[in-house]
Amino acid sequence: MTTTPGTLYIISAPSGAGKTSLVKALLQTGIDLSLSISYTSRQPRPEEMDGRDYHFVTRQVFEQKLQEDEFLESAELYGNFYGTSKKWINETMTSGRDILLEIDSQGARQVRAVFPVAVGIFVLPPSLEVLEMRLRQRAQDSLEAISRRLAAAREELSHAGEYNYIIINDKLDRALQDLKCIIQAERLKTAKQLVRHHGLLAQLTRTSVL
């Protein structure tokens, strides 16, 4: 079997849609896929760990990396910077591993400009009321922050049509199954299978069964 370049999956959602929980559930299944860890200039939340959730750096370090063109995409959100390592993405895809990239729609457009065949997946909440409830349940966010996130959510939701797939995250187990099905379907596409199994196909087409 021949190794093919990895597939880049972009997953986006408004804050509170449950994207992070969905991605964590996917990784816990043991799926053969690498999660891209973004760089950020914001402070870590109590439960977050450097190198696992984000690469936490100072604003000065982030701006230096930005000037040195180290990011495939970058964006400012709620006064903090976020960016994806260009070198890591290229090396991982070249090795044949699939990558899951958690970014917003602004970053997704930047990535698709470089990787137009990237597979876009957008996660929707079942309703705006559920989205607001999820945001209010976050103890670390102030009322002002929740209001900002709700306003940003409406803007983010307007870009759902730019993606290849849409998942409704009402029940986590159902959303997880949908996400796994998308990845499996992409891996079985003819273009990739022809490269992976060209030896088998060549053997089958030249060997007589009689």
From Swiss-Prot:
Primary enzyme class: transferase
GO function term, MF aspect, one: guanylate kinase activity
Residue span, Guanylate kinase-like domain: 6-184
Species the sequence originates in: Nitrosospira multiformis (strain ATCC 25196 / NCIMB 11849 / C 71)
Name of this protein: Guanylate kinase
PANTHER family for this protein: GUANYLATE KINASE, GUANYLATE KINASE-RELATED
Assigned EC number: 2.7.4.8
Function: Essential for recycling GMP and indirectly, cGMP.
UniProt binding sites for ATP: 13-20
Location within or outside the cell: Cytoplasm
Reactions performed catalytically: GMP + ATP = GDP + ADP
Record bears the keyword ATP-binding: yes
Protein family: Belongs to the guanylate kinase family.
CC annotations in GO: cytosol
InterPro entries: GK/Ca_channel_bsu, Guanylate_kin-like_dom, Guanylate_kinase, Guanylate_kinase_CS, P-loop_NTPase
Keywords, in A-Z order: ATP-binding, Cytoplasm, Kinase, Nucleotide-binding, Transferase
Domain of life per record: Bacteria
Keyword set includes ATP-binding: yes
